[in-house]
């Protein structure tokens, strides 16, 4: 009946609001190829709010890429949309969460210098410009190294004699870059490590 349905819905809403106010939540943000999604779950893993941001990579100078501004704006946009959803559903302002996780494209090439400057535009997983490197690495390791893997991009840059290679301090994936942007720490998750090499 309508009364029990309304009561059940109100109870669930009250539990979600309590979880938000007590930081009994986890926020996951996923950088997909065309959309960045933010999902807030409670301590029982129930989705309680979400937000998203549409984005699209561009083909510039022979490379599929997103700019650092695209990444920052997308992160902010998806989070802002989530905050709005929380406010509309529960009437509270989201100011903190219990845990945060980032997921993003595990392949690609983002080399940085010692000062933290990106040396070349982010080369996404869509690029298939590393055929020579991929073949040579396959021969060397007797293991398939797909063109999208970061090591193939790095080795191709070396084979091409690209100027930036001498200035590389570290390289990372998009997920690791977002993690560093948020925390200041250089961390690479196990899934991303598999995509680098």
Model-derived features: positions:
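N-terminal glycine/serine-rich phosphate-binding loop of ATP-dependent small-molecule kinases
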Residues: 2-120, 135-136, 165-167
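Gly/Ser/Thr-rich active-site cleft segment
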Residues: 31-33, 102, 112, 141-197
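Residue-level structural signal for beta-strand termini and adjacent loop
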Residues: 53, 123-124, 192
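Conserved donor sugar-nucleotide recognition element shared by glycan-biosynthetic enzymes
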Residues: 68-71, 75, 130, 150-153
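Residues that scaffold the ATP/ADP-binding catalytic core of kinase and kinase-like folds
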Residues: 121, 133, 181
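Carbohydrate-associated surface elements
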Residues: 127
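Hydrophobic packing residues within well-ordered alpha-helices of enzyme cores
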Residues: 134-137, 157
